[in-house]
C-alpha cells in the first residue's frame, strides 16, 4: 500500500504540473493573439508581438501553436480579448500595512474575470482599491549577464532608457510605456536581440516581510494565476518569482 501511495502522490504532482503547463500555454497563446491584433502581424514591425513571441519561446510554447496564434489573429470568431487591470490593498491583519497587488488579465468576459479575481482577493484578505500611486508601469528589456555593462549603459542612455537594474541572472533596461517601440528598435540595432521584454508594473517601494508572509504570498499568486484570464501578478513584496517575469 505504501508503494501505491507513493505512485498516487507522484501521479497527482504530475497531473498538477501538466495542468499548470497547459494554463501557461493558453495564456501565452492569448498574449500572442492580442499582440498580433495590436499592430502588424509581423514581429519586425510590432515590438509587442516580438515580446510575446520571445516570451512564448522562453516558456517552451511549441512552434505550431505560435504560428496558429498569429494566424488566428485575423479570425473574427477567435475571442475578442481585452486588457483589464485590477488593483487591491490589504483590508486587515493578514498582510502588512501598505501591502498592494496589481493583477493584469486578458479576457473575453470582463464580468466573469472581475468576479473570479475579486473572490480570490477577498478570500485572501484584500479589497479592490486604487493603488496606482504605489506602482509605476514600464517597458522592460532583459539582457544576459554576459552583456558588456558599459556598452549596455551607453546604448540605454542613447535610447532614452529610464533605468537599468542588475538582477540575479540578467540586466533589465527600463523605459516608459510610450517609448517601448522606439527603445526596442534602438537596443536591437546596437546591442542585438534581448532575451525577453514586456510591459510591466513595479512597486515604487518594496516591503521586507518575514518568511511566513512570503509563504502566504506564494499561495495568493498561485490562486490568481490558476485563473485562465490572469496574465501577471505584481505586488509590493518583491519575490524572485516576480523578478523573473
Curated annotation (Swiss-Prot):
Disordered as annotated region, ranges: 1-22
One of the record's GO cellular component terms: cytoplasm
Protein's UniProt keywords contain Transcription: yes
GO molecular function, one term: DNA binding
Keyword Transcription: yes
InterPro entries, per database record: Integrase-like_N (IPR017856), TACO1_YebC-like_2nd/3rd_dom (IPR048300), TACO1_YebC_N (IPR049083), Transcrip_reg_TACO1-like (IPR002876), Transcrip_reg_TACO1-like_dom3 (IPR026564), YebC-like (IPR029072)
Subcellular location(s) of the protein: Cytoplasm
One example of a Gene Ontology biological process annotation: regulation of DNA-templated transcription
Pfam entry (one): Transcrip_reg
Keywords for the protein's UniProt record, in alphabetical order: Cytoplasm, DNA-binding, Transcription, Transcription regulation
Principal subcellular localisation of the protein: cytoplasm
Homology family: Belongs to the TACO1 family.
Protein name: Probable transcriptional regulatory protein NSE_0641
Organism: Neorickettsia sennetsu (strain ATCC VR-367 / Miyayama)
Amino acid at each position: 500500500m505504501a508503494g501505491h501511495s507513493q505512485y498516487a502522490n507522484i501521479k497527482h504532482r504530475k497531473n498538477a504540473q501538466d495542468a499548470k503547463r497547459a494554463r501557461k500555454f493558453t495564456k501565452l497563446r492569448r498574449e500572442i493573439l492580442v499582440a498580433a491584433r495590436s499592430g502588424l502581424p509581423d514581429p519586425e514591425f510590432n515590438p509587442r508581438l516580438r515580446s510575446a513571441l520571445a516570451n512564448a519561446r522562453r516558456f517552451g510554447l511549441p512552434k505550431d501553436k505560435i504560428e496558429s496564434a498569429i494566424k488566428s489573429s485575423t479570425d473574427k470568431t477567435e475571442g475578442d480579448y481585452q486588457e483589464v487591470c485590477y488593483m487591491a490593498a490589504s483590508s486587515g491583519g493578514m498582510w502588512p500595512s501598505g501591502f498592494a497587488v496589481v493583477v493584469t488579465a486578458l479576457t473575453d468576459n470582463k464580468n466573469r474575470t472581475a468576479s473570479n479575481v475579486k473572490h480570490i482577493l477577498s478570500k485572501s484578505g484584500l479589497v479592490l482599491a486604487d493603488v496606482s500611486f504605489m506602482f509605476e508601469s514600464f517597458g522592460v528589456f532583459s539582457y544576459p549577464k554576459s552583456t558588456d555593462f558599459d556598452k549596455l549603459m551607453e546604448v540605454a542612455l542613447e535610447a532614452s532608457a529610464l533605468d537599468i537594474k542588475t538582477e540575479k541572472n540578467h540586466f533589465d533596461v527600463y523605459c516608459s510605456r510610450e517609448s517601448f517601440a522606439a527603445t526596442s528598435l534602438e537596443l536591437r540595432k546596437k546591442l542585438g536581440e534581448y532575451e525577453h521584454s514586456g510591459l510591466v508594473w513595479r512597486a515604487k517601494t518594496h516591503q521586507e516581510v518575514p518568511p511566513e508572509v512570503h509563504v502566504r504570498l506564494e499561495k495568493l499568486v498561485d490562486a490568481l494565476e490558476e485563473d485562465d484570464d490572469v496574465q501577471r501578478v505584481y505586488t509590493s513584496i518583491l519575490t524572485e518569482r516576480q523578478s523573473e517575469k
